[in-house]
């Protein structure tokens, strides 16, 4: 399973929010490039970047920081936040980003998503951010009437490469992932699901590993890495491609669920 460190950008700095609340941000570094290099040095094979300013503004804002990170590291990057038109998506791909994460437009302009999936096959990921099972949009400031599972099915049909599922009530809380919601989502589609939000311990990571056969292929870890609750190295050893040992086939996963 992929363990993907998150870098959230706000005014050019690396921060973490609590439940998506911009007024409850905590600055972890003034230099996101140094943070990106640190995760690479610790074994990351992929990086998740969110332009928080962009998510609110509806356009990419932290271009300089994104470009600097892309130039400084060699592992692939996925970027989300403010990608709501074709030019913004083209803009980040021109910076050397591997995947573009679309959220709001998936709800508001599904036809555009389909066109972008055709133009960039395998490079469009849909970020589904849910509050009580309903999709939130525009930097989590609005909640739609669209069910997360319904949107995931529609986006799979449009050609999306993967779904990143974030439970907003868990994000930044270290309260553990929403396993039931992830299980339901993964069962509804055949493309990979990447879990995000709430991971606080190796136990949480192992509980997600139990969902890997159902299609949960990765996990994004944010606050827990920055607070030291989890080290990236131990996360990779626990559930990553280089994990210490394979899990016995007769292990009862029900205790994790």
Swiss-Prot record:
Upper taxonomic lineage: Bacteria, Bacillati, Cyanobacteriota, Cyanophyceae, Nostocales
PANTHER family per UniProt: 1-(5-PHOSPHORIBOSYL)-5-[(5-PHOSPHORIBOSYLAMINO)METHYLIDENEAMINO] IMIDAZOLE-4-CARBOXAMIDE ISOMERASE (PTHR43090:SF2)
Name of the protein this chain belongs to: 1-(5-phosphoribosyl)-5-[(5-phosphoribosylamino)methylideneamino] imidazole-4-carboxamide isomerase
Record carries keyword Isomerase: yes
Entry annotation: catalytic residues: 8 (proton acceptor), 129 (proton donor)
UniProt cross-references to SUPFAM superfamilies, sorted A to Z: Ribulose-phoshate binding barrel (SSF51366)
InterPro entries: Aldolase_TIM, His_biosynth, HisA_bact_arch, Isoase_HisA-like, Isoase_HisA-like_bact, RibuloseP-bd_barrel
GO cellular component, one term: cytoplasm
Pathway in which the depicted protein is active: Amino-acid biosynthesis; L-histidine biosynthesis; L-histidine from 5-phospho-alpha-D-ribose 1-diphosphate: step 4/9
Organism the protein comes from: Nostoc sp. (strain PCC 7120 / SAG 25.82 / UTEX 2576)
Keyword field: Amino-acid biosynthesis, Cytoplasm, Histidine biosynthesis, Isomerase
Subcellular location: Cytoplasm
Pfam families (UniProt xref): His_biosynth
Biological processes per GO annotation: L-histidine biosynthetic process; L-tryptophan biosynthetic process
Keyword Protein biosynthesis: no
Catalytic reaction(s) noted: 1-(5-phospho-beta-D-ribosyl)-5-[(5-phospho-beta-D-ribosylamino)methylideneamino]imidazole-4-carboxamide = 5-[(5-phospho-1-deoxy-D-ribulos-1-ylimino)methylamino]-1-(5-phospho-beta-D-ribosyl)imidazole-4-carboxamide
Enzyme Commission designation: 5.3.1.16
């Amino acid at each position: 399973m992929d363990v993907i460190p998150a870098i959230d950008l706000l005014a050019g700095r690396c921060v973490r929010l609590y439940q998506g609340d911009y007024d409850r941000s905590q600055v972890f570094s003034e230099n996101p490039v140094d943070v990106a290099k640190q995760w690479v040095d610790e074994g990351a094979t992929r990086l998740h970047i969110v332009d928080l300013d962009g998510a609110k503004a509806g356009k990419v804002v932290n271009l300089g920081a994104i470009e600097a990170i892309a130039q400084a590291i060699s592992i692939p990057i996925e970027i989300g936040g403010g990608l709501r038109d074709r030019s913004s998506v083209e803009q980040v791909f021109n910076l050397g980003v591997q995947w573009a994460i679309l959220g709001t437009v998936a709800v508001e302009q599904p036809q555009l998503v389909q066109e972008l999936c055709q133009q960039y096959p395998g490079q469009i990921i849909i970020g589904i951010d849910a509050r009580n099972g309903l999709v939130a949009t525009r930097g989590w400031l609005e909640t739609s009437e669209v069910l997360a599972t319904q949107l995931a099915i529609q986006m799979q049909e449009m050609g999306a490469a993967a779904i990143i599922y974030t439970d907003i009530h868990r994000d930044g809380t270290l309260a553990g992932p929403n396993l039931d919601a992830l299980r339901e989502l993964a069962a509804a589609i055949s493309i990979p699901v990447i879990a995000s939000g709430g991971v606080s311990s190796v136990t949480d990571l192992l509980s997600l590993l139990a969902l890997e056969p159902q299609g949960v292929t990765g996990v994004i870890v944010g606050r827990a890495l920055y607070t030291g609750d989890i080290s990236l190295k131990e996360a990779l050893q626990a559930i990553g491609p280089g994990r210490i040992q394979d899990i016995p086939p007769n292990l009862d996963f029900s205790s994790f669920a």
